[in-house]
């Protein structure tokens, strides 16, 4: 999936002019139209392969399914809540974001919110504008010596931590992915959630909105917090249960809250916004000139680099595709797809478990990107759905009734060939096993069911191969096969045979085109199949 045919991009939200310029300088056609209805968006996408949005455009399943040419959706920002990821993935559409673009702006807003909560600056400003001079009402608290709990220690959480440490705050945090050692490297003591609640004077959330993070702060967790805790949410509406927050504010369990995001935007229920101890903004986390310019620039560069085959970054729904752009991994992706195509041609439409096994130091972590490529080869011929690719392979293989396992064989130290990088694809419990490798940048078939090819058989994209197994003692076999090719009007381009395995070698013929039928062939050989990937 090289995206070489991605030629036209629609920008449907307001972005910095640098975005359009970078795309055009990269050879892409660009259309900019904003405030489109769903119907207008679908109409505009009919001749566009790419779409770039901010948060206003809703890329729903209806839009995705109606956009026949759409290949890539780019989100100029971090959150992809406005893109139906499941629908995009099912259709094989790549979704990208710019995770670095607005990190600093979001972190700075969070820090500003913490300071405003501590000193009630917005409330005091409103009082002054109302003609009042009320010094006693707005008694604040120092940040120095207070404990800040940071839930989510990604880019934004880290930036918040280092800035608030400068105010003398002690920073503790929680992140299921970041290790305690990494957290400690930027001054955060990582603790379990149940230990964080009673410790913190301030809590700020910086997680994506997932089922596991929805309502992370709720009636139960507020009850475990220190009385008078202050809460900041500049991440995603819904991470803090808004009803529970209001009850905590009303009871005094929560002394104040700063909200840049809401479950519904704009919020129709004004109870939180109107509460005197709540500071609120209309989702301004990324609303700085620098962030908008950075996000527009980053997503445009990502599109151009992708089209030119240089690199792929910011991928949300297809990590395997990122690896496909690596110079080392790219030929192995091609081998994996070829092996999957071979396996489908050989075993028919297999059911059960396909085993994908890597061997060799450089392939230690490659299984997760190679197995989707094997699936692409397996399903591409059999699937009656949309094109199978590295984006939707894992989703579609389950629906095809197949289970795919991935493992790594480190080899036995000192054993001959143990350091060789190999890819094995096999159907569990059935006599179908193929082993391949990469020579230079060329995928090669090394073995079929233990029968070794010396030299290996090149697996070149677009090159039809006929594979068959026959008795080694039949001297008339090869002339008969060549005669059958001539009758079908197919030229023989190459021919290789394996070493004898169980008395029967495998033969591989490179052909000018696939044969119309193998029925006649199967009368002369023990087994035969053909494929082209």
Swiss-Prot record:
Disruption phenotype: Decreased level of free serine, glycine, taurine, GABA, glutamine, and threonine in spinal cord and head. Impaired central nervous system (CNS) with shorter neural tube length and overall growth retardation. Severe atrophy at the thoracic level, particularly in the dorsal spinal cord. Poorly developed dorsal horn and adjacent mantle zone. Neurons fail to develop neurites, particularly commissural axonal fibers.
Record-listed cross-link Glycyl lysine isopeptide (Lys-Gly) (interchain with G-Cter in SUMO1), residues: 21
PROSITE patterns assigned: D_2_HYDROXYACID_DH_1 (PS00065), D_2_HYDROXYACID_DH_2 (PS00670), D_2_HYDROXYACID_DH_3 (PS00671)
Catalyzed reaction equations: (2R)-3-phosphoglycerate + NAD(+) = 3-phosphooxypyruvate + NADH + H(+)
Gene Ontology, cellular component aspect: myelin sheath
One GO molecular-function entry: NAD binding
GO process terms (BP): G1 to G0 transition; gamma-aminobutyric acid metabolic process; glial cell development; glutamine metabolic process; glycine metabolic process; L-serine biosynthetic process; L-serine metabolic process; neural tube development
The protein, known as: D-3-phosphoglycerate dehydrogenase
Native source species: Mus musculus (Mouse)
């Amino acid at each position: 999936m090289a995206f070489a045919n991605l030629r036209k991009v629609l920008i449907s939200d307001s972005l910095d002019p640098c975005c359009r310029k970078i795309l055009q300088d990269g050879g892409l056609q660009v259309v900019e139209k904003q405030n489109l209805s769903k119907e207008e968006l679908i109409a505009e996408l009919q001749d566009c392969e790419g779409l770039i949005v901010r948060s206003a455009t809703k890329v729903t399943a209806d839009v995705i399914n109606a956009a026949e040419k759409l290949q890539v959706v780019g989100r100029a920002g971090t959150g992809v809540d406005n893109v139906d990821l499941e629908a995009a993935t099912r259709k094989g559409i790549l979704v990208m974001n710019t995770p670095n673009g607005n990190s600093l702006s979001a972190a700075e807003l969070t820090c500003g919110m913490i300071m405003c909560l501590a000193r009630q600056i917005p409330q005091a400003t409103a009082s002054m504008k109302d003609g009042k001079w009320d010094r006693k009402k707005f008694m604040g608290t120092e940040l120095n010596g207070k404990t800040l709990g940071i839930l989510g220690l990604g880019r934004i959480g880290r930036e918040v931590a280092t800035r608030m440490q400068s105010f003398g705050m002690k920073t503790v945090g929680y992140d299921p992915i970041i290790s305690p050692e990494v957290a400690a490297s930027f001054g955060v003591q990582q603790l379990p959630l149940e230990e964080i609640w009673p410790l913190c004077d301030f809590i700020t959330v910086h997680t994506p909105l997932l089922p596991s993070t929805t309502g992370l702060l709720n009636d139960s967790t507020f009850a475990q917090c220190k009385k008078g805790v202050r809460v900041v949410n500049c991440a995603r509406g819904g991470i803090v249960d808004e009803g529970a927050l209001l009850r905590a504010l009303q009871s005094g369990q929560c002394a104040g809250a700063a909200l840049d995001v809401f479950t519904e935007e704009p919020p129709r229920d004004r109870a939180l916004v109107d509460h005197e101890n709540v500071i609120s903004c209309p989702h301004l986390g990324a609303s700085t000139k620098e962030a908008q310019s950075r996000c527009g620039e980053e997503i445009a560069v990502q599109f151009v680099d992708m089209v030119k085959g240089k690199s792929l970054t910011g991928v949300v729904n297809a990590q395997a595709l990122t690896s496909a752009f690596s110079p080392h991994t790219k030929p192995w992706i091609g081998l994996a797809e070829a092996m999957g195509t071979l396996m489908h041609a050989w075993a028919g439409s297999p059911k059960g478990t396909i085993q994908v096994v890597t061997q060799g130091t450089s392939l230690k972590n490659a299984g997760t990107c190679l197995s989707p490529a094997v699936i692409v080869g397996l399903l591409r011929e059999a699937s009656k759905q949309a094109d199978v690719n590295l984006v939707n392979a894992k989703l579609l293989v389950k629906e095809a009734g197949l289970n795919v396992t991935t493992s790594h064989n480190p080899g036995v130290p000192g054993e001959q060939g143990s350091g060789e990088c190999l890819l094995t694809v096999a159907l569990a419990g059935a006599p179908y096993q193929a082993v391949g490798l990469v020579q230079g940048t060329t995928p090669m078939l090394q073995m079929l069911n233990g029968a070794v090819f010396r030299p290996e058989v090149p697996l070149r994209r677009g090159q039809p191969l006929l594979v068959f197994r026959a008795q080694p003692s039949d001297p008339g076999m090869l002339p008969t096969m060549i005669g059958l090719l001539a009758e079908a009007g197919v030229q023989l381009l190459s021919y290789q045979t394996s070493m004898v395995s169980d008395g029967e070698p495998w033969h591989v013929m490179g052909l000018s085109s696939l044969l119309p039928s193998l029925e006649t062939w199967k009368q002369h050989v023990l087994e035969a199949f053909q494929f082209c990937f």
